[in-house]
Structures are given as structure tokens and as C-alpha cells.
């Protein structure tokens, strides 16, 4: 009977909707707990401003909440943290200002303790800048947007493996926007890559991403700007 099957269909739809609402509610409860943890962690550091509290409390996007938290997250011993402990944060700040044409007169002051020489000082300062850029919400959003709009996945068969890779024939010379690539295709391509039969690349590549971030952070064309540019290129690998 049609009305019975329609009625059963409606019941099933309602059950699905109830399940979806329950899942959504569970996720929101988890996020609320996570936000409490984040707020208390930042408060313990003495860095919780009223504006920061408001931003975290008002956001119900898990990715955004984690991005806001990232600069305050207790860190493992990173290269940037090691550089800070060597007293190189003021040098990183100096480089970021990008006002100095030459650094010759500034660098000797930072060569002390565990800092071996001027190049070591610059490397540490670049590590600090790279970490700051990688934790900057604007930078992360820029790369995310670039990937969602432009990312293209390309696969080619590894030379000489054509016979062995026969089951991946569809992907011997394949290219498609990543957002249109179905999950089963993506899994097959990744499997072919892990078996050493397909060569896979996803663009925009690191160079394009670095170019976008350089537009955001690099001003002028002096020695400081060049150092910041190098740090920004390093930051791209942090943000992947």
C-alpha cells in the first residue's frame, strides 16, 4: 500500500533527521568543552584578553577555534622555541620591521652564548618568523582558500612500470581539480603512489603558496625583507 510505504519513508526521514541533530549536538558539546580547556590554558599563561575571550566564545567553527588557539598552544621544543631561548626574538622583530638596509652593525650583538656566528643568529630569527607566520590565522586562511579554489591533483605512471601498474591505467596521465576528485579516485591514486607505481603532485605547489604569503609579509627590497622572504618560504612547510 502506497500510503503505508510513504508513511514508513517519512518515519525513516525523521529518524535520519533526529540522528543528524543528535550528532550535531554531540559535536557542539565537544566543542564547548574544548573551548573551556582552551580558555583556561590561555588564562593560565596570563594572555587571555577580553577580545580574545569573546572571539573564542562566539566561534562555533572547530577549525577557526583551533586556529585562534594555535599561537597560545603549549609548544614542543621547536627550532623557533630553541631560538627564543638563545635570545633571538628581538632580532626576529627587527627583521619583521624591514626597516634596516644593512644588518652588519646589528648582528654582532646577537652572537653570544649558544649562538655560534651571525648566520646562526639569522637562521634562529628566521625560524621564529616562520613559526609566527605558520600560526597566523590570516596566513592559514589564505592557504586554505587557495587550495579549495585552485588545487589540482595530477598523476603519471612511473616510467618503466606501465605493465605492473596496469590496474591504475586510468591514472597514467590524470589531472583534475582536487575539489571534484571523488574519494574513490583519490584513494586509488594514493594507493598507486604508495606502491611506487604512480607519481602524484598537487598544485598550487609550495612556490605558489610562498608567493602568496610573501605578498602578505614582505615589504621593500632590503636585507631584512630578504630574510623575511626566506622565513616565509620555510613557513609554507609548517602550514601543510
Language-model regions: role of each:
Residues 7-12, 239-240:
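Conserved small/polar residues in nucleotide/adenosyl-binding loops
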Residues 14-22:
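Catalytic phosphate-handling regions of large nucleic-acid enzymes and associated NTPases
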Residues 17, 27, 31-238:
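Duplex nucleic acid-engaging cores and interfaces of nucleic-acid transaction enzymes
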Amino acid at each position: 500500500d502506497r500510503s503505508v510505504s510513504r508513511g514508513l519513508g517519512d518515519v525513516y526521514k525523521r529518524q535520519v533527521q533526529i540522528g543528524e541533530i543528535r550528532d550535531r549536538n554531540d559535536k557542539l558539546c565537544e566543542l564547548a568543552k574544548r573551548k573551556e580547556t582552551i580558555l583556561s590554558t590561555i588564562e593560565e599563561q596570563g594572555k587571555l584578553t577580553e577580545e580574545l575571550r569573546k572571539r573564542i566564545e562566539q566561534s562555533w567553527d572547530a577549525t577557526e577555534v583551533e586556529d585562534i588557539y594555535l599561537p597560545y598552544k603549549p609548544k614542543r621544543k621547536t627550532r623557533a622555541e630553541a631560538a627564543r631561548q638563545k635570545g633571538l626574538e628581538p632580532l626576529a622583530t627587527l627583521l619583521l620591521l624591514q626597516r634596516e638596509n644593512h644588518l652588519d652593525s646589528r648582528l654582532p650583538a646577537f652572537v653570544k652564548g649558544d649562538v655560534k656566528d651571525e648566520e646562526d643568529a639569522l637562521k634562529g630569527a628566521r625560524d621564529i618568523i616562520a613559526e609566527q607566520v605558520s600560526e597566523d590565522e590570516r596566513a592559514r586562511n589564505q592557504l586554505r582558500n587557495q587550495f579549495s579554489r585552485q588545487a589540482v591533483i595530477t598523476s603519471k605512471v612511473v616510467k618503466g612500470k606501465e605493465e605492473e601498474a596496469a590496474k591504475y591505467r586510468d591514472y597514467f596521465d590524470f589531472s583534475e581539480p582536487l575539489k571534484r576528485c571523488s574519494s574513490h579516485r583519490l584513494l586509488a591514486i594514493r594507493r598507486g603512489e604508495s606502491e611506487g607505481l604512480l607519481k602524484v603532485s598537487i598544485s598550487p605547489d609550495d612556490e605558489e603558496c610562498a608567493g602568496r604569503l610573501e605578498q602578505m609579509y614582505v615589504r621593500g627590497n632590503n636585507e631584512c625583507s630578504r630574510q623575511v622572504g626566506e622565513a616565509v618560504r620555510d613557513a609554507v612547510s609548517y602550514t601543510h
